[in-house]
Amino acid sequence: MRDHVAGRYAKALFDLALEHHVLDQAEADVRTLGEVLHATPELASVLENPSISAEELKQVLQTSFTGFNTIVLNTILVMVENDRASEVLSLPEHFIALLNEHRNVATAIVTSAYKLSDEELTNVKETFGQKSGKTLEVENVVDTNVIGGLRVQIGYTTYDGTIETKLTRLERELLKA
């Protein structure tokens, strides 16, 4: 349920930020919110604590995020007023997903046997950016179970060029013959 509700608030925030031409400021504020919530588990606990009143929560949030754009801060406060304080924890993830979709940006998770160099990551970014038609942000995940090659996941699409997969395909072909 949390994801669904947080997604609706994120969409409303995104639409308002776009309409008022403050998308970059909203992005910065929402990223900061996500970082603060991640770095301060105490604040996350406060948001999930039903025994803390909405007024107390609003005071804490207004004090903590005074420099935030009014639209971002008001969205968070409305969530608290509507008894959705715990949903604030998922707001950054949903907002950034909407922003990336709007900007035609996707995350490519590149799994390899070793940490790839910047040059290798740039090559992956360019090659798979062309295939997907998106601007890619690349994350390199090292998996020691990968013998060699790469596995690239962009959204729900996986390009598997690992040696293990190639050997499995070869085995199937040989068994057919």
Curated annotation (Swiss-Prot):
Keywords from the UniProt entry: ATP synthesis, Cell membrane, CF(1), Hydrogen ion transport, Ion transport, Membrane, Transport
One MF term in the entry's GO annotations: proton-transporting ATP synthase activity, rotational mechanism
Any one Gene Ontology cellular component term annotated for this protein: plasma membrane
InterPro entries linked to this entry: ATP_synth_OSCP/delta_N_sf, ATPase_OSCP/d_CS, ATPase_OSCP/dsu
Predominant subcellular localization, coarse grouping: membrane
Domain of life: Bacteria
Compartment annotation: Cell membrane
Ribonucleoprotein as UniProt keyword: no
Gene3D superfamilies (UniProt xref): N-terminal domain of the delta subunit of the F1F0-ATP synthase
Keyword flag tRNA processing: no
Topology of the protein relative to the lipid bilayer: Peripheral membrane protein
Protein family membership: Belongs to the ATPase delta chain family.
Purpose of the protein: F(1)F(0) ATP synthase produces ATP from ADP in the presence of a proton or sodium gradient. F-type ATPases consist of two structural domains, F(1) containing the extramembraneous catalytic core and F(0) containing the membrane proton channel, linked together by a central stalk and a peripheral stalk. During catalysis, ATP synthesis in the catalytic domain of F(1) is coupled via a rotary mechanism of the central stalk subunits to proton translocation. This protein is part of the stalk that links CF(0) to CF(1). It either transmits conformational changes from CF(0) to CF(1) or is implicated in proton conduction.
Record text on subunit structure and interactions: F-type ATPases have 2 components, F(1) - the catalytic core - and F(0) - the membrane proton channel. F(1) has five subunits: alpha(3), beta(3), gamma(1), delta(1), epsilon(1). F(0) has three main subunits: a(1), b(2) and c(10-14). The alpha and beta chains form an alternating ring which encloses part of the gamma chain. F(1) is attached to F(0) by a central stalk formed by the gamma and epsilon chains, while a peripheral stalk is formed by the delta and b chains.
Entry protein name: ATP synthase subunit delta
Source organism: Exiguobacterium sibiricum (strain DSM 17290 / CCUG 55495 / CIP 109462 / JCM 13490 / 255-15)
